[in-house]
UniProtKB/Swiss-Prot annotation:
Keywords per UniProt: Electron transport, Membrane, Mitochondrion, Mitochondrion inner membrane, NAD, Respiratory chain, Translocase, Transmembrane, Transmembrane helix, Transport, Ubiquinone
Protein family: Belongs to the complex I subunit 1 family.
Organism: Phoca vitulina (Harbor seal)
InterPro entries hit by this protein: NADH_UbQ_OxRdtase_su1/FPO, NADH_UbQ_OxRdtase_su1_CS
UniProt topology in membrane: Multi-pass membrane protein
GO biological process: aerobic respiration
Enzyme Commission number: 7.1.1.2
Upper taxonomic lineage: Eukaryota, Metazoa, Chordata, Craniata, Vertebrata
Organism domain of life: Eukaryota
Protein name: NADH-ubiquinone oxidoreductase chain 1
Length: 318
């Protein structure tokens, strides 16, 4: 039974990821005053299926000088971790209702760094290694602010369980009292998922395509699926933290519609940002975090710790 539950979670995720690639190409197309994919199937709807068939039927080439085990393990680990992070998400009921769901998701996103590092190192290519080192430095750096912002939100939530965020936001979305945190969170999620304008790992002019440059066919598709699954997952997380959907136990489908619309809006905002902004320079990327975001998030975290003490003489409730 548990396996059926897992499969019923994985298949919709993979379908959502497949069609997100189509939505991205369509959105970018219309923003550049062109049509986007429109040949394969009606309105190009079968394009992701055609892409998947093409990628998974190609021969997966492996460089002679690469480290075989790590080279093969890296994309499998990337996709496995990307799918595992969906387990505690309440939509409206999670697959496993964890007491420390937030910590579990932070731990999984930290482990994803290893798949990037292994792929860059095992490829035995200088471009892949430089891309991987950039990605790792960027991901680890932005996780610092993500963790501090999460701590601030959890102080308002009063629990590490994700489901209680729905109850916390019944009367007021947390984006209103904590809008600076929400803005920094959104920018940090862009950096965490290696999306434009923070896609330094894929600098075409200097690094070809980054840490996955030596990958082809199936393993490349697995990295691709992992990246887009992480994008949707991060937007779901943002919706949970700051745009809590109203949940009526007697009509859970209303929650699902509300939740999906907000997640879709945030995902299209990701694509809109990609179409609008040029890439950051690497030093600007690091300065933004260590010199701007970190002091601000620390100050706001202290504010959220001291507020209940000063206003109600009670310690923070977590």
């Amino acid at each position: 039974m548990f396996m059926i539950n897992i499969i019923s979670l994985i298949i919709p995720i993979l379908l959502a990821v497949a069609f997100l690639t189509l939505v991205e190409r369509k959105v970018l197309g219309y923003m550049q005053l062109r049509k986007g994919p429109n040949i394969v199937g009606p309105y190009g709807l079968l394009q992701p299926i055609a892409d998947a068939v093409k990628l998974f039927t190609k021969e997966p080439l492996r460089p002679l000088t690469s480290s075989t085990t790590m080279f093969i393990m890296a994309p499998i680990l990337a996709l496995a971790l990307a799918l595992t992070m969906w387990v505690p998400l309440p939509m409206p009921y999670p697959l496993i209702n964890m007491n420390l769901g937030v910590l579990f998701m932070l731990a999984m996103s930290s482990l994803a760094v290893y798949s990037i590092l292994w792929s860059g190192w095992a490829s035995n290519s200088k471009y892949a290694l430089i891309g991987a080192l950039r990605a790792v430095a960027q991901t680890i750096s932005y996780e610092v602010t993500l963790a501090i912002i999460l701590l601030s939100v959890l102080l308002m939530n009063g629990s590490f369980t994700l489901s209680t965020l729905i109850i916390t936001q019944e009367h007021l979305w947390l984006i209103f009292p904590a809008w600076p945190l929400a803005m920094m969170w959104f920018i940090s999620t862009l950096a965490e998922t290696n999306r434009a304008p923070f896609d330094l790992t894929e600098g075409e002019s200097e690094l070809v395509s980054g840490f996955n440059v030596e990958y082809a066919a199936g393993p490349f598709a697995m990295f691709f699926l992992a990246e887009y699954a992480n994008i949707i997952m991060m937007n779901i997380f943002t919706t949970l933290l700051f745009f809590g959907a109203f949940h009526n136990p007697y009509m859970p489908e209303l929650y699902v519609i509300n939740f999906t619309v907000k997640t879709l809006a945030l995902t299209i905002l990701f694509l809109w940002i990609r179409a609008s902004y040029p890439r950051f320079r690497y030093d600007q990327l690091m300065h933004l975090l260590w010199k701007n975001f970190l002091p601000l998030t620390l100050a706001l975290c202290m504010w959220h710790v001291t507020l209940p003490i000063t206003s109600a003489s009670i310690p923070p409730q977590t």
